[in-house]
């Protein structure tokens, strides 16, 4: 099993002027730890599950990934996850391409159907009903695939999006892998089977095993090899520096049901120090495979 990080909190010791330096140290610490994935949360406002108010710090995701791309050299980079409503799909494909080119081919597209209504209303971003958001998500996945096809610069005609030209130059160095967040059995996991390179799940090992059974059936329905999909989980109860054995034991149960990557969330304050403190987890998790 591999380890990844998702940075959800930007309230940093030292205040606003300390954020850039701390994020640079996060990138350095993440790579030094041997983790394979570094991601950020993508929201306009802070979300309630962090325990912080909506008014807490929240940086724009792709700008911050560009900053991290310049301060790392090996680790994969992505957002976990971008709401489909946040950016027009043509611009989204160009943005992810830019991160990929500037990082030397390390960008992923992490995407989901969006859920936080308050931030949409707050900034005046349209928030359509859930059925429409999933329609838009599927069209966005198709648009990104077309824009990352160097042999297809033609139009895209969808129900919600119409692009006269799907030009994207330069092309990505490596076609960005697509991680689709969420575990809805009827829509989300079907989209993973059709378009995803990775899923991101949560819940107990038994719940994750059930979701993977559903995903496997969707793969059978669309003729997809289930083994080609990387299985990741968001581990809400992360390790504590100096006390990692309990976390590794818990992740062993997830490895048994087929999870490839555990993604943990550094706290605010001094996240780089926390990453340094849990680095011994990486070789321990590697032994679970």
PLM regions and their residue ranges:
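Active-site beta-loop-alpha junctions enriched in small/polar residues
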Residues: 8-10, 43, 82-84, 112-116, ...
């Amino acid at each position: 099993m591999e380890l990844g990080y998702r940075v959800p909190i930007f309230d940093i010791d030292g205040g606003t002027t300390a954020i850039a330096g701390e994020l640079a140290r996060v990138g350095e610490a993440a790579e030094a730890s041997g983790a394979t994935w570094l991601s950020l949360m993508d929201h306009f406002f802070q979300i309630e599950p962090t325990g912080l108010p909506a008014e807490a710090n929240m940086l724009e995701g792709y700008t911050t990934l560009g900053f991290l791309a310049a301060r790392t050299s090996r680790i994969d980079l992505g957002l976990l996850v971008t709401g489909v409503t946040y950016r027009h799909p043509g611009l989204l494909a160009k943005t992810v391409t830019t991160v990929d080119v500037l990082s030397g081919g390390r960008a992923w597209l992490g995407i989901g159907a969006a859920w936080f209504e308050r931030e949409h209303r707050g900034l005046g971003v349209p928030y359509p009903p859930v059925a429409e958001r999933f329609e838009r998500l599927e069209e966005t996945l198709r648009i990104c695939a077309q824009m990352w096809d160097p042999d297809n610069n033609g139009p895209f005609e969808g129900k919600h999006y119409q692009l006269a030209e799907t030009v994207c130059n330069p092309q990505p160095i490596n076609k960005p892998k697509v991680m689709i967040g969420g575990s809805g059995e009827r829509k989300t996991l079907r989209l993973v089977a059709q378009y995803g390179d990775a899923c991101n799940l949560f819940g107990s090992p038994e719940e994750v095993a059930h979701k993977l059974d559903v995903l496997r059936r969707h793969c059978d329905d669309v003729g997809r090899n289930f083994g080609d999909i990387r299985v990741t989980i968001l581990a809400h109860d992360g390790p504590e520096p100096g006390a990692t054995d309990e976390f590794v034991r818990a992740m062993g149960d997830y490895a048994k049901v087929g999870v490839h990557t555990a993604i943990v969330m550094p706290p605010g304050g001094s996240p780089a120090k926390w990453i340094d403190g849990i680095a011994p987890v990486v070789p321990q998790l590697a032994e679970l495979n």
